[in-house]
Amino acid sequence: MSKSHLLKYLLISPNLPVGGFCYSEGMESFLHNKNLTDSNSVKELIISELEIGQIRLDARLLLDFFDIFNQINDRKNLKGNLQKLMSLDKWILSSKDSLEMREQQIQMAKSLFDLTKEFGFEYLYENDKKSSWSLAWSWACYCFEITKLEMVENFFYAWSANQLSAALRIIPIGSTKAQLIQRDLLAIISKVSKEIMDKEIDDLYFGNVGLAMAQQNHNDLYTKLFRN
């Protein structure tokens, strides 16, 4: 097993979330409106997001960032690629539907950049410290020499594990049921990841506005689970 294959567990481990934070991303609002009542409703919400939610766009941008890093490393069109990198990063960050979501992205990205710096991979391409989670994730995977397909799969896995960690405290659903949900999500994550690999950004379909509305209906998305 290669070193890069092992390094990916630094990113996806639910026991070591980046920066020690977990975000509920609107679950409290769903719970208040009685849309989340049990493990099945949590599972349906996560599946819906994986299949038609904005998380797909975040995942697709990973590939663009990864390709840009490769071109920059090869000294190809440095100015143009740096401009494209910053433009895409600002675009995906501004696409978030609430201030809390943007702050979440910035915090998680900063923590991941701090981690990669400790591993000897300091990010030097932007002066603006307000970067997106997708950019930081792609940078980490590029530095750790993780393949693009694994990068996308791990991204979806980590996101779904984060949602389940939040659901454990908010609903709660119980740790055993959360593990069963995570198991059932594996096939969907694999399918969706391959779809993302084969599509351009303009070809992605998004039709799930429920979570975006839920995120706007409550003020504090930050759930402090690992700072005890």
From Swiss-Prot:
Its main location: cytoplasm. It is found in: Cytoplasm. Keywords: Chaperone, Cytoplasm, Nickel insertion. Gene3D superfamilies: Urease accessory protein UreF. GO terms for cellular component: cytoplasm. Pfam families: UreF. GO terms for molecular function: nickel cation binding. Required for maturation of urease via the functional incorporation of the urease nickel metallocenter. UreD, UreF and UreG form a complex that acts as a GTP-hydrolysis-dependent molecular chaperone, activating the urease apoprotein by helping to assemble the nickel containing metallocenter of UreC. The UreE protein probably delivers the nickel. Belongs to the UreF family. PANTHER family: UREASE ACCESSORY PROTEIN F (PTHR33620:SF1). This is Urease accessory protein UreF. It comes from Prochlorococcus marinus (strain MIT 9301).
